[in-house]
């Protein structure tokens, strides 16, 4: 039995079934699309590509981030497979070269402990002062960007 489905087929299924499965789907879907258009009008786009940066470039904003848990880091290292290691996500402000990780701090610590000198990262460049807090909340409350290794 073939368990593979193409993205376009799954999207079509969701479009068909969601109005019955999700309360107020149509209204909420239109609101989400309008919200995206508003974000794009403000110049907010998807991050582009992945870059490798040295460990010294990264920082954690602990007014936003949770403390690193050594047990969680060990769990990542114990199961580590580089083929499924997603890049960390970080914000870069124009007044600093520091990349503030908002998703993947445990992954970053695990990579450093395993001997990596550079870490793959997707960077969001913004001067919005609360962006890393907002991004952390979005990622952790909605599951967006969650990786199986994190």
Regions found by a protein language model. Name each.
Residues 2-102, 106-113, 117-125:
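Short alpha-helix boundary/capping and kink motifs at helix termini
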Residues 122-150:
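Amphipathic, charge-rich alpha-helical segments that serve as recognition/docking helices
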């Amino acid at each position: 039995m073939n368990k593979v489905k193409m993205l376009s087929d799954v999207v079509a299924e969701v479009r068909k079934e969601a109005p019955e499965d999700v309360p107020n789907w149509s209204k909420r879907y239109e609101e989400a699309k309008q919200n995206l258009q508003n974000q794009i009008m403000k110049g907010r786009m998807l991050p582009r590509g992945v870059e490798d940066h040295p460990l010294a470039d990264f920082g954690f904003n602990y007014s936003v981030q949770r403390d690193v848990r050594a047990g969680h880091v060990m769990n990542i290292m114990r199961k580590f497979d580089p083929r499924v290691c997603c890049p960390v996500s970080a914000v870069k402000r124009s007044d600093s070269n520091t990349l503030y990780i908002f998703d993947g701090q445990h992954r970053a610590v695990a990579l450093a402990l395993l001997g990596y000198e550079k870490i793959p990262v997707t960077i969001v460049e913004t001067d919005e002062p609360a962006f890393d807090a907002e991004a952390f909340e979005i990622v952790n409350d909605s599951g967006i960007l969650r990786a199986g290794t994190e």
